[in-house]
Amino acid sequence: FGKKRVFDTPASESALTAMGAGMALAGLRPLLIHQRFDFMIYSLDQIVNWISLWSYKSAGKSQIPITIRTVVGKGWGQGPQHSKTLHSWFAHLPGLSVVYPSSPYEAKGLMLSSIFANYPTIFFESRSLHSMNEYVPEEPYFLDPTKAFVRKKGRHLSIIGFGPSVTNALEVSSKLEKLKKISCEIIDL
């Protein structure tokens, strides 16, 4: 994309987030990346008081179509200050979409949907996705972030999850079928 569209910024999460909001208000569709969720907390004022509420403040006349991607979860050298996943905080904010894919295929489809949405999205990306292998088509495709996916059909029990918990649910359901003959449905939010 070139230096006009992809660039590094100083390590000031609040300034970076405010700049992304301004770019969105100017007609762009910024993809803002906070590499560590824990530092994204410094930008809560911009996200909570401005980005999520802008449509309401403008009586629906103006939107902030920004996607804020942040990486969460376990990984190399993570202490307690770098291991938080506070997605539920953001799920309670009116005007803000929260996305937490459970597979590489979902990550691509939900990311493209987030970028082209006319509302702000926080995109939580689990580090566990980085080591997953799955076929992902090269051509663009979009997944509806408001729809749940049935990852596995079952008759006896439903397990509902999102993000990395879906992988855990699939593993547990496989063991339950082998050991106890319990058929599990897995629903991915």
Segments predicted by a language model, with ranges:
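Short helix-loop-beta junction
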Residues: F1-K3, W89-H92, N168-I187
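Residues at the starts of beta-strands that form the adenosine-phosphate
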Residues: P65, H156, S183
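Glycine-/acidic-rich phosphate or pyrophosphate-binding loops and their flanking alpha/beta elements
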Residues: G109-P120, L129-L179
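Thiamine diphosphate
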Residues: F1-L129, E134
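Short, conserved beta-strand edge motifs with alternating hydrophobic and charged residues
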Residues: F124, I160-G161, E185-L189
